[in-house]
Every structure is written in C-alpha cells, then in structure tokens.
From Swiss-Prot:
Protein's recorded name: ATP-dependent DNA/RNA helicase DHX36
Organism, scientific name: Bos taurus
Effect of residue 65 to A: Decreases G4-DNA-binding
Superkingdom classification of source: Eukaryota
DSM (DHX36-specific motif): annotated segments: 56-78
UniProt GO MF annotations: ATP binding; ATP hydrolysis activity; catalytic activity, acting on a nucleic acid; DNA helicase activity; double-stranded RNA binding; G-quadruplex DNA binding; G-quadruplex RNA binding; histone deacetylase binding
Length: 1010
C-alpha cells in the first residue's frame, strides 16, 4: 500500500478529512488548546471534594482512608510518568526526506499484500495490515503454508551448506578406511617405543595405577559389548589409560588404522591436560600428527587421522554431528565424567543412544564416578558395568559437631537464629523434595540434639544449637585454619566456599591476623574473577616451613588437582544457578552440597598422604543431603539447546527432550519454544526459519547470535563481536583482593560517558589491542592498570575470529577479518552500536525513573515482569543518576539476594522503535503516543508516529530478505532500497538528542510542559 504522505497527513498531525481526529486533538493539547486540556485540569483540581486541600473525604474510615490515599498516589505517579515520557520527533528536513523515501520505495516495490513477519515480535503481533490467521479460510492458510515451504526449500542450499570449512572440520570428517601399510607402520612404532627410555619410565608409573592391572578385563568387555560403563574413583587412571588400552590392543592385533577414539571432557582445561599427559606417557608430543591430541573451541592440536585418540569438549562432538550425523569415521566414543550431568553430555548421551542402531560397529564407553554408575547402565538397556578401585590414602572425616568439640569453638555473637527459616530451601528453588527434606530435618532436630548430648560436651551441643546453618561461618573456618596450623602436621589446606564474596571475606579475615601476614604462609584465592597469574601458584609446591592455603569454589573439586593438599575444609555449600519457569528468571543461590560433591572434596585430601576433611554441616544435615546435584538440564533455559535439536534434525523438540535421562519439565520446554518463536527463529510448526538456521549455527545463545547478525548488517561488526564474545564467555575484568574500589574506578574510567557496560568492554578491548601493538611490556602494563586478564582478552579475540568465519561462510560479510573496513563503516558511532545491542537483546528492557523524593538524587529501575530491580554493584551504571533516556537494555537478570541486572546499556527511543517489539499508535487522554509492545511509551505527533511505523515495516521486510539470502550491504549504491532505508534509520538514530520535555524544539515547548 503506497501513501502520498502530504496528501494523507496534514502538517498538524491528523488526516485532513479527520477534522477533530488526530489534527484536532494535536491542536487541542499541544497548540495552546486551553479549553479542553486546561478545563480538565481545573475539573481535576476540585476532586478533593469535601476533604479540601487534597485531604480524604470526611465520611471515609479506617482501611478506606488508606485505599483512598493509595489510589491518589497511584494517579500522581501515573501523571508523573506521563510527563516524563520522551518525545519522538524529527526536524522538518528529515521528515520530508523520509516521506519521499517511503513514497519512492513503496511505489518501486509495488509490494504484494502478503503480510511480512516482524523480526521483533511474535507472528501474531502483526502491524494490523492483515487479517488474523484464525479469521482466514483454511484453503488460503494451506496455500500460504505450501508457498512458504517451497520458498524455504529453494533457499535451503544457501542456508544449510556453509561455504567455508576450516582445517579442524576437515580433520573430523576424514573417512576411516582400513590401511594395511599403516597397520604395519603403527605396530613397528609401538614396538620401537618399548625401547625408548622415556616410554619405559612412564610405563613404570602406569603399572602402579589400579586400572593397569585390569587392562585385559577392560579390553575384553569393550570388545564384546557395544556399550560399557566403567566406574572408578579419582586417581584410578580411567581417563588416561582406557583409551590407550583400546588403541594399543588394535595396533597389536594389526588393525591400528581401524581405530579412531574420541573421548569427551566436560571442561577445556581437562581436555588439554589429559591429552598432554597421555602424549607424554606415549613418549610423544601432543598433536602434530602423533597418536594423541585435543580439540576445544578455537584451539586444537590434532593427532593423526587413523590409529589415534582425540580428547575434546562435548560441544565439539555436537558440532561434528551437524556435518556427520552417524559419526561414521569414529570407531570408539568415550564419554568421560558423565556423572557431572552437564547439559551437553546429557544430550550427547541420548544422541549416542539413538545412534547405536545405525552404527552396530560403534563402541561406546561411559565413564563415571562410582556413585551412580547403575543409572547409566539402566539408561543404556542394562549394559555391563566394570569398577576400577581408587588409589587414595585414607582420609579422616569430621562433621560440624566434631570440629566444634575438637577446637572448642565459641561463636563471637551468641544469637539464636531459626534453624528452619530456609534450611534446604535455599534461595528460591521451589522443589518439592527440598521442602520434604526440610520438614524431616525440623521433625528430627529435637531427637538429634538429645543424641548429641550423650556423645559430646554440653558446650558443643549449645554451640551447634545456636549456629545459623544458612550461612557459611567464616569465623569458624578461620579458627579451624589457625588450629590446623598450630596443632597439625605440615600440608596444604584447601577450603571450599560457594562464591567470590565468601572467598574475599575469608581472605581479609585471615590477613587481619598478624600470624598469617608472615612469609610462612601463601594464601591463594581461586575463582574465575581472580587474575590467572595468581592462580598458577596453586600448582607449585611450597618451600619447607611454608604452608599453602587455597580458598576455592567447586572448580577445585574435579577441574584441577593440587597434589600437596592434606587438609580439606568443606564449607558445605555450592553456588547453583536455577531457572524459574513461572517467573522466567534465573536464580543463583548457595545450595547444600550433594553427597557426590562431599565425596569429591574429601578425595582431594588423600592424594599424596593420609589426609583430613572437615565438613561444616552436622550429622543430621549430612544424612539428608541429595545424592547428586540436580542435572543442569533441569535448571537452565533451553533455547540454545532447542535450536541444536532442530539443526541436528533430531525430530520434535519436546519428543527428543522427553527421552533424556532426566527430561526437563513441559513448562520449561514450552517457554523456550515460545521465546524462539517470538525471536522468529522457529515458525509455528516448530521448524527453523532462515534466521533460526543462522542462529543455530552460531556457537552462542540466540539473542547474542541475533546481535552478531545485526552487527554485520549495520556495519559495526568489530565492536559488536567484542560484546558478543564477552557476553557468551565472560568479561575481561578481574578483581584482585583488596583492590575492589580501585578496580571499579578503572572500569568506570573505561566507560567514559557511554552509560553502558557493553561499550565499556569494547573500550577496554580497543585499549588492549593498541597496547599489544606497541609490545608485550605495554600490554602487560595496560592490563595491570585497568585490572584486565590478558588471557581472557586473547580468548575474546579468538572468538571474534570464529564469529567472523561463521558470518563469511553464511554470506553476511566479505572478509573473515572482524576489522575489515567494509564491515565497520559505523563502528565509531556509539548510538548505532547501542541500537544493535538493543536489536539482539530485546525484550530484555528496563525502565529508569528518577526518585526525587530522597535527599540525594537516585534512580529506580523497573522491568515489566518483576517491578523494581537493582543494577548490580559491578555495573558502571550502578551509581549513575544522569541518564539521557529512560530505558536500559540488559543481558543477564538474576535473582540472588535481590533481582539484579548484571550488565546494562542506556538506549534511545529510536533504538526501541526500530529494533523492539510491535508498534502501536495510541492516545493517552490528551497525549498522542507511539508504543512498543504496549508498555514502552513515547510522546509523538501522529504524523511522525506513522512515518516511524512505515519505516519500521520497510526495515522488517529488508531484514527478512537479507536473512533468507545473505549478502553484504553495498553502501556505495546510494540509490538502492537497502542503502536508502538503512541510511535513513541510521541517520535518525545518530542524530537523536535527549528527548524530554525540557529540551524539545520550540514547536513542542508550550503550555502542556510549562
């Protein structure tokens, strides 16, 4: 439908024929229309009635008075909010240009009447240009569906087949044909090794491992069964030895070329360290075409293609499956550490289970800690199990009552706290089993205390009774460390705490004591926020007479091994993220450890000599701990996984997820599908849209993927890739203990006046690149000055390269260089980058309101679903009061003690109008408004609102075409529709000033605002 805008829309706002419609109301409310508007104001003034001067009417009593004042306050707040609304306006020159542009584009296209799908709103939130689907005849719906299906099939070659395949992918897709010459060569190499001194020395070590004595038994079981479960304690050698047993057995039988083993690891650090260890045991270097190598995201040292062992992260196999659904070149797949139950390994188990019938020759080995091996065997049709005994020294365990009795601990503050306030129901994790256990705990408490009095001193029982077990008692830990240092033998101490705050506080507590300030102690905090330079000290043995104290999160349970630990202090809590499907919010809280966690922690103490493990919970609590942590799939959003299921062609999302070992709830699955439909990544048949295909191929969650695509389309690629990498990995800032305030100040310095955590990371990254170009010393000084991790920055740099490869392969850019000038025409414009952030992260929007009722200026922040929320203390916006606009876009919202926005960026009205949800034009009494999803509301003259809405429609059409057939925008072709529409939108975003009633152009400043 084409408009002659000057014919249909008068300069004063409404259709010429509408008389008192838009035109009349515009004149009445803004053009000095004193009658209606002022009259209503006067009428409202008398509303106080008999109360006089705004007091309540005299006939009201009790609760009625309170309700009257509440209603009055609500009206006052609503009016204040109306007056604070930003005004969307444009000068006459731009208005004229956009009218001409729209007229030209719409005439040129002579658009067909088929409704366009909005990228930013659910399909049923159209712009009102098409009858709702439910009102259409079935025959019409069927024809439309078939047409769409045919279009999609025609475009499939573009979408499914990436143009670019990297070296690692080529390696993975290599065919595995038997090769007699290679078989002989591998056999000769293995025989030769047996005379190599390095190999012989390593062999002596291997022979001492419990797994080595079971070599024949293990190999026979794997040979004779398609699936085998191997369980074993830490230190038994299952991860390093089982793969070697299989490979050497094949080589010795003259079938080495037919053996290609892939072993998955849950973490990057373990994939690398295990591969390097196995290579060393085989007297080889890791990778370089030898027998053993690794592949993790953005890093690989690949082994030879046949007769080899590849250690890789679980995500690598899932990506591999996209190109080779049957893993046809793999002879053995070993899934290690499956007891951890992370999301990817649970999914891979189900995929592999389905694969067994297609690949009867494929051997599957599942490796787990001892505790739950039976469950995995049952899942794979009661396949055989074999157990390898552990190799640890005995460890003496102490529970809370033992510790208090042993060190005669008395809390400083003797305040009785309710034992039953939360108990097992830590945070907001509403699980029935937790509630049931809490009820049992409460019921058994009196009997437990009676039993304690028979075995422990009265003072110990009194302390146990008074302690608040919701909190980790850091004073008790400090006292226990002091006791170990003074009374026990030498040996490193490892303390497990739930999070950064506890680690930081305990460190300060120890350093406040003169004893720990001496050079006889090395205290090392171990956390992802800590600089990695400090953390390398963890692995170094200390000189005689020096005691190492490591304060860590659960990263020290399995990911790393600290050899010299003799004493473990188990704080009893672990930070867990959960997803509340009812309120659509992530929550993070300190939960009680599981029995499996406790066992792992205990095992850390007995690796080199007999050890001691101190658990900071009582024996009643110990008896009620869960066997394992809740599997990740039951406590995380599922959007990224749903896209993976579709790209791997695993069938219906709900059907596939229902077959997992622990299926997620229907609510969680439906919520994720709904979000993906709103994002236009899935259609109503739950099939991938063209956008969905691109998002599924990007190794990030969907909102970040969408941001990456927009960064390419709007030619601000480099900064947007920096933001995307940091959101999907982590930001590069570190917080050394004792330097928190200085670190915060440096971060704010990098923020400049952007009012954006995301642009702060961009500025930090740019500074690092410049420093790096000048040399290593400058890079080191820069990172030191601004509290940045050079390792993390390097990882972000590598990830940006990977994202650019994906974009090149899909056709969105013409170079794999993130800094290619053609992809960065708008990269210096902060407002355009903010618009792209908004395009990716919408609808994660928060509203800012200035709170003037306080003595000092403050802002309150709200979201649509949560009401009042808080900006996280680490955000650069936490103390900000001078915002240009009233809206923030954020990535992570999480409930801990409060609901926090962890990162946010201030965005302008045009960002939200062009890249937000469904647009509607409304009237709010005397105010003309334009709204996004009916809650983000701006003042706007009707003619401007209609121009914006039409321009937005053109943008949606253009974007849909770009996604279906990607190619870079040709900015030199200024006459092209693409260039004209995008340039007009960019121009509006770039030139938008702070648009509140205080700084409007003269034609807006009239009686309404004075």
């Amino acid at each position: 439908m084409s408009y002659d805008y000057h014919q249909n829309w008068g300069r004063d706002g409404g259709p010429r024929s509408s008389g008192g419609g838009y035109g009349g109301s515009y004149g009445g409310s803004h053009g000095g229309g004193h009658g209606g508007n002022r009259g209503s104001g006067g009428g409202g003034g008398g509303g106080g009635g008999r109360g006089g001067r705004g007091r309540h009417p005299g006939h009201l009593k009790g609760r009625e008075i309170g309700l009257w004042y509440a209603k009055k306050q609500g009206q006052k707040n609503k009016e204040a909010e109306r007056q604070e609304r930003a005004v969307v306006h444009m000068d006459e020159r731009r208005e004229e240009q956009i009218v001409q542009l729209l007229h030209s584009v719409q005439t040129k296209n002579d658009k067909d009447e088929e409704a366009q799908i909005s990228w930013f709103a659910p399909e049923d939130h159209g712009y009102g240009t098409e009858a709702p689907a439910e009102n259409k005849p079935n025959s019409v719906k069927n024809v439309e569906h078939q047409e769409k299906k045919m279009i999609n099939q025609e475009k499939r070659p573009f979408r499914i087949r990436d143009k670019y395949i990297d070296r690692d992918s080529e390696y993975l897709l290599q065919e595995n044909e038997p090769d007699a010459t290679l078989d002989q060569q591998l056999l000769e190499d293995l025989q030769k090794k047996k005379t190599d001194l390095r190999y012989i020395e390593m062999q002596r070590f291997r022979e001492k491992l419990p797994s080595y004595g079971m070599q024949k038994e293990l190999v026979n079981m794997i040979d004779n069964h398609q699936v085998t479960v191997i369980s074993g304690e830490t230190g038994c050698g299952k991860t390093t030895q089982v793969t070697q047993f299989i490979l050497d057995n094949y080589i010795e039988r003259g079938k080495g070329s037919a053996c290609r083993i892939v072993c998955t690891q849950p973490r990057r650090i373990s994939a690398i360290s295990v591969a390097e260890r196995v290579a060393a045991e085989r007297a080889e270097s890791c990778g370089n075409g030898n027998s053993t190598g690794y592949q993790i995201r953005l890093q690989s040292r690949l082994p030879r293609k046949q007769g080899s062992i590849l250690y890789c992260t679980t995500g690598i196999i899932l990506q591999w499956l996209q190109s080779d659904p049957h893993l046809s070149s793999v002879s053995h797949i070993v899934l290690d550490e499956i007891h951890e139950r992370n999301l990817q390994s649970d999914v891979l188990m189900t995929v592999v289970k389905d694969l067994l019938s297609y690949r009867p020759d494929l051997k599957v080995v599942l490796m787990s800690a001892t505790l739950n091996a039976e469950k995995f065997s049952e899942y794979f049709g009661n396949c055989p199990m074999i157990h390898i005994p552990g190799f640890t020294f005995p460890v003496v365990e102490y529970l809370l009552e033992d510790i208090i009795e042993k060190i005669r601990y008395v809390p400083e503050q003797k305040e009785h706290r309710s034992q039953f306030k939360k108990g097992f129901m830590q945070g907001h994790v509403n699980r029935q089993e937790k509630e049931e256990k809490e009820a049992i705990y409460k019921e058994r408490w009196p009997g437990y205390l009676r039993e304690l009095r028979q075995r422990y001193s009265a003072s110990t029982v009194d302390v146990v009774e008074m302690m608040d077990d919701e909190k980790v008692d850091l004073n008790l830990i400090a006292a226990l460390i002091r006791y170990i240092v003074l009374e026990e033998e030498d040996g490193a101490i490892l303390v497990f705490l739930p999070g950064w705050d506890n680690i930081s506080t305990l460190h300060d507590l120890l350093m406040s004591q003169v004893m720990f300030k001496s050079d006889k102690f090395i205290i090392i905090p171990l956390h992802s926020l800590m600089p990695t330079v400090n953390q390398t000290q963890v692995f170094k043995r200390t000189p005689p007479g020096v005691r190492k104290i490591v304060i860590a999160t659960n990263i020290a349970e399995t990911s790393i091994t600290i050899d010299d630990v003799v004493y473990v202090i188990d704080g009893g809590k672990i930070k867990e993220t959960h997803f509340d499907t009812q309120n659509n919010i992530s929550t993070m809280s300190a939960e009680w450890v599981s029995k499996a966690n406790a066992k792992q922690r205990k095992g850390r103490a007995g690796r080199v000599q007999p050890g001691h493990c101190y658990h900071l919970y009582n024996s009643l609590r110990a008896s009620l701990l869960d066997d394992y942590q809740l599997p990740e799939i039951l406590r995380t959003p599922l959007e990224e996984l749903c896209l993976q299921i579709k790209i791997l062609r695993l069938g219906g999302i709900a059907h596939f997820l229902s077959r997992l070992m622990d299926p997620p709830s229907n609510e969680a699955v439906l919520l994720s599908i709904k979000h993906l439909m709103e994002l236009n990544a899935l259609d109503k048949q739950e099939e991938l849209t063209p956008l969905g295909v691109h998002l599924a191929r990007l190794p990030v969650e969907p909102h970040i993927g969408k941001m990456i695509l927009f960064g390419a389309l709007f030619c601000c690629l480099d900064p947007v890739l920096t933001i995307a990498a940091s959101l999907s990995f982590k930001d590069p800032f570190v917080i050394p203990l004792g330097k928190e305030k200085v670190a915060d100040a440096r971060r704010k310095e990098l923020a400049k006046d952007t009012k954006s955590d995301h642009l702060t990371v961009v500025n930090a990254f740019k500074g690092w690149e410049k420093a790096k170009q000048r040399g290593f010393r400058y890079e080191k000084d820069y990172c030191w000055e601004y509290f940045l991790s050079s390792n993390t920055l390097q990882m972000l740099h590598n990830m940006k390269g990977q994202f650019a490869e994906h974009l090149l392969g899909a056709g969105f850019v013409s170079s794999r260089n993130p800094q290619d000038p053609e992809s960065n025409i708008n990269s210096d414009n902060e407002k355009i980058i903010k618009a792209v952030i908004c395009a990716g992260l919408y609808p994660k929007v928060a509203k800012i309101r200035l709170n003037l009722g306080k003595k000092r200026k403050m802002v309150k922040v709200y979201t649509k679903t949560d009401g009042v929320v808080a900006i996280h203390p680490k955000s650069v916006n936490v103390e900000q009061t001078e915002f240009n606009y009233n809206w923030l876009i954020y990535h992570l919202k999480m409930r801990t003690s409060s609901i926090y926005l962890y990162d946010c960026t201030e965005v302008s009205p045009y960002c939200l109008l062009f890249f937000g949800g469904d647009i509607s034009i409304q009237k709010d009494n005397d105010q003309e408004t334009i709204a996004v999803d009916e809650w983000i509301i701006f003042q706007s003259p009707a003619r401007i609102a209609h121009l914006v809405k039409e321009l937005r429609k053109e943008l949606d059409i253009l974007l849909q075409e770009k996604i279906e057939s990607p190619h870079p925008v040709d900015w030199k072709d200024t006459k092209s529709r693409d260039c004209a529409v995008l340039s007009a939108i960019i121009d509006l975003i770039k030139t938008q000033e702070k648009a509140t009633p205080r700084n409007l152009p003269p034609r807006f400043q009239d009686g309404y605002y004075s």
